[in-house]
């Protein structure tokens, strides 16, 4: 297809009347793909911004822009810009199927000579934001109007109110007088024809107040956000209310109740226009408001998916409009509640408490229940009224009483956990247990040390078989503090002279031959000493050399005297 002649710098091309607006473009390519085939909607000169990180540093250059509509459903709608109006190869191609938002009358926080006298609008895609500057306001309005016609963005005349308005939030709830108008175009949405549909609805004033006959269906937009590019609407209940971003202006007018004129009308000001996928996070927390007559018209509950059936049954309001569909059976509400609460049944309430319909049998499987009824007893003895809090245990006895007692015990007392033994630590050796000395008598030593003038040594005494089992321990202690180092102080146990039955002990122990003198300390034969019990070691014997001990004492005394004589008195000053 030949390029437009370079002589008219700006021209407005009317849309092709034989082109039917499609709800999606399933085979659209990525941004940057060159597409030369398609219908040219508009072309002209615009000043393009550099990348977002270089807005202040680089120059805003003037480029020749061409807005093309895809020739077939597989061709994307693109906005191409060239170096000049005679170039054959575009510098870049912007895929409008990826356009998320269109803002008009954009102002930046810095001033540049190229944009001071122009009118700026931007196109936001998932990859980059393009700031475009037109020389006149009329030129900017024509560009915005043409882009909105392709992308399916909804336009509004500004009435002094400035702000961002999401196109996904427009027309989500229509009045009860419009169901036939909004629903009659469902076949045209599912099967596109060659003739554009025309809306016959009267445009109401925005914002539309929510009518009382609207039900809240949760997360319809979030469930279909990823399928916004599908070829047709999935289910009938979501068809007139979920907004598709690349639907034509006429289709948006059908859903929202607006009738939009052609491209010839001029728009004096625009609000921010965005596609629904940008506000997907908002719809997850918000809800749509859908008339019940439209949600239930043309399909049954069986045609809905599982999530849609749950959302439809979760609403607790009934519509007051819509003719014969104003009332809904209670079974559907019962199914909806049971779908959210599996394993639980709803019991209806009645005016009479004594009737069988208002009582729940406490133990239906027990064999005593029919016998009680045959005996003519009151039904309240075996039934619990639904609306009453009083429970009678007259006839049912064991199972329920045990259950109630178990519940009271479980609620009143918490289960006590076993104590934690914190001494059990890994890689830690346990301390040895102390010996049991309860049966052993503690040896009481004498508080004084009686001097013995003559050393003596004791030999082993002769005992019988009972006393020979315990060895006789001896100990020698020498007092080195006394001036007479030859004297020895012995600590004999007074119990050593205790006579033993069946044995004899010598009154005068003989002297031992040799230089080593031992001191014999006799303990009770029947009670072992603590040293032998606790340590279990052999007793050491010490040999004392008198000459060396005396020489050492003299040397220490001489050194102490020499040190005292060499030190000056404390009061003297050097």
UniProtKB/Swiss-Prot annotation:
It comes from the Eukaryota. SUPFAM superfamilies: PH domain-like. It comes from Homo sapiens (Human). Residues 39-152 form the PH domain. Pfam families: PH. Belongs to the GAB family. This is GRB2-associated-binding protein 4. Residues 457-478 have a biased composition (Low complexity). InterPro entries: Gab1-4-like, PH-like_dom_sf, PH_domain. GO terms for molecular function: transmembrane receptor protein tyrosine kinase adaptor activity. One of its GO terms (biological process) is signal transduction.
